[in-house]
Amino acid sequence: MKLALPQTALTTTSILLIQSLSAESAWTKHVIQPPVQGKIHSAVAHDWDADGHLDVLSSFDGEVVLLKGPTWAPHAIHRFSPGLARSKPRPACIHTCLMDVDGDGDQDFIGSNNTVFWLECPDQPFSGQAWTYRTVDDEILGSHCVLPGDVNRDGKLDLIANSSRDATRTPYPESLAWLEVPKDPHTAESWVRHIFADRDAPGGSHYTGFGDVNGDGRPDISCAAKGGEKFPEGNWFAWWQQPEDPTQVWTKHLLAADQLGATNILPADLNNDGVVDYFATRGHGFGVLWFKGPDFELIEVDPTLPSPHSLDLVDMDQDGDIDAITCGKEADGIVALYLNDGQGNFSKRTLDENQGSYDTRAIDMDGDGDFDILIAGQASKNIVWYENPLR
């Protein structure tokens, strides 16, 4: 499905410098998983066997699959089947992350597939045995994002997840939650749930961001939501301010409404003024943008980029400021890098075309000391990574 370009830019100043790909060395594309039958929404990377090569963990065609680097030999570690949760699973997780849930020193897998669950990494992750499946939360529903973060500042990671479905499908409709790991995650039926945005996140909420925005020492949480016929109150960017007691309801701050197809919003100091800003994308619409703190003026960066459904923020060129990477979700998507000059002015580099992505992450895939780009291809049905030519 191709989108029609917007007639006009949505708001305020557009700051974008177009930089040709030929001006610098091209990024090399490496295929981890060739196209499969179904869609691939998310992929994460870690060296599970400590052999010096990153492995990739993803889900597709009804299984969670561990791809052993550097040859990417597949090892199925879980098969989705009805009966493990109240809702029938889909062929793949909509989003995933890694977290040492049980504190044993290895990275466990957390996924959202009509329920939120975790798979315990065994001592021998490539032995052929299935990783043990356990429930995180089977009551929230519509968790388009699972994000680790120490919400209550107790030195232990928690999990942030959304519950976007309506009241006919979940007792926590149009809400956002953070979930505490129970004392014994191996035996607990579910994690400790805290609804911090109680029916306060309408529409098709997508991805969350985590970080202290107002400088009070307490991390806050941002979110974006698409709209549409099924999500009539979406199309917004907002953040929630953490109170002294994080188990209570948080204060919502709407950044912008009427943002067609809003999906991603992440906090970072983009102009090096010591104040937190937000970088955002409209992944079910058009454009990338940022909100300049502390007043959060909306500044368009590239208002016509189609379907930038994924986002990550890191210093890609190692010049001391935060850059952005994104990719369109359709099969003809554009892989784009926005290099920051340190003042919030961004130079666009088109790294590739005809590559879709639901999930894009910056990670050093080849161990050379710079950030590469890992992409789960969704409409492209593949997993690829792009090698940073910096080193």
Positions of predicted regions on the chain:
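N-terminal secretory signal peptides that target proteins for export/translocation
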Residues: 1-5
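Short helix-onset patch at the extreme N-terminus, typifying the N->h transition
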Residues: 6-9, 57
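Bacterial N-terminal signal peptides
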Residues: 8-20
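Beta-propeller-forming repeat regions
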Residues: 21-391
